[in-house]
């Protein structure tokens, strides 16, 4: 499988992709460079596909990749409900795409490049 190295060693690249995928699931949009967005798109689409399957093996594969971070905290009937990124993936994000076969993300190019190095910036969001 072909992939971009992104100027990092394999452990750093994998950690960065895991973190950015988790942030995309939690916030449903991130601002990043174009090349990073194209790589994160691949992993995010795979995680959403696992979420659509919803079986135990899919949950375990997704749990091995998505970081265990708090995605949402709210109150329901005198109890505080804390939802992790993995729970949000399986209960909120994946059911939204049950009738869609792939293409869960969208890349929108920003008009202004990054200030320091003029890297092309994009918004990666869930459709």
UniProtKB/Swiss-Prot annotation:
Keywords: Ribonucleoprotein, Ribosomal protein. NCBIfam families: L17 (TIGR00059). This is Large ribosomal subunit protein bL17. Belongs to the bacterial ribosomal protein bL17 family. It comes from the Bacteria. GO terms for biological process: translation. GO terms for molecular function: structural constituent of ribosome. Pfam families: Ribosomal_L17. Part of the 50S ribosomal subunit. Contacts protein L32. GO terms for cellular component: cytosolic large ribosomal subunit.
